[in-house]
């Protein structure tokens, strides 16, 4: 009986998908783009840090644009044609990332802002004094 290596057993095959969801998580320090199928299974992801931006350059709109272009290009190689976009977070890269996705040629069915907003929940942390 041949022994199957642990890596090949754990690693799933590259999933091809035609319709997916693109999640944009725009924080103040980084922008993370995750592409999932309609069930929520992650197909691929990209971030400003993974695209080579380090330190304060990671939080720029240009870094978010590069991360979005990288993620959409890789997902189109896997067959993505139509997508929904979920944007979360108040970061500076949210609009630029969405603009990059719109330019890429993927058909967007809708764009939804899913940033969590408290209905007067927990007390926020005190303001910074610099």
From Swiss-Prot:
Transmembrane segments: none annotated. GO terms for cellular component: chloroplast; ribonucleoprotein complex; ribosome. The keyword Chloroplast applies. It comes from the Eukaryota. Induction: By abscisic acid (ABA) during heterophyllous induction. It holds the Pfam family Ribosomal_S11. GO terms for molecular function: rRNA binding; structural constituent of ribosome. It is found in: Plastid, Chloroplast. Keywords: Chloroplast, Plastid, Ribonucleoprotein, Ribosomal protein, RNA-binding, rRNA-binding. Gene3D superfamilies: Ribosomal protein S11. The keyword rRNA-binding applies. GO terms for biological process: translation. Part of the 30S ribosomal subunit. PANTHER family: 40S RIBOSOMAL PROTEIN S14/30S RIBOSOMAL PROTEIN S11 (PTHR11759). HAMAP family: Ribosomal_uS11. Belongs to the universal ribosomal protein uS11 family. This is Small ribosomal subunit protein uS11c. It comes from Marsilea quadrifolia. The lineage of its organism: Eukaryota, Viridiplantae, Streptophyta, Embryophyta, Tracheophyta. The gene is rps11.
């Amino acid at each position: 009986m041949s022994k199957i290596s642990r890596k090949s057993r754990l690693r799933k095959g590259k999933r091809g998908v035609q319709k997916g969801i693109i999640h944009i998580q725009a924080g103040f320090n980084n922008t993370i783009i995750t592409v999932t199928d309609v069930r929520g299974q992650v197909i691929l992801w990209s971030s400003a840090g993974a695209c080579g931006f380090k330190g304060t350059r990671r939080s720029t709109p240009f870094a978010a644009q590069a991360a979005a272009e990288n993620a959409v290009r890789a997902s189109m190689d896997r067959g993505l044609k139509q997508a929904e976009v979920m944007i979360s977070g108040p970061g500076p890269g949210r609009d630029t990332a969405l603009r990059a996705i719109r330019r890429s040629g993927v058909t967007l069915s809708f764009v939804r802002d899913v940033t969590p907003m408290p209905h007067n929940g927990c007390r926020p942390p005190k303001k910074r004094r610099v």
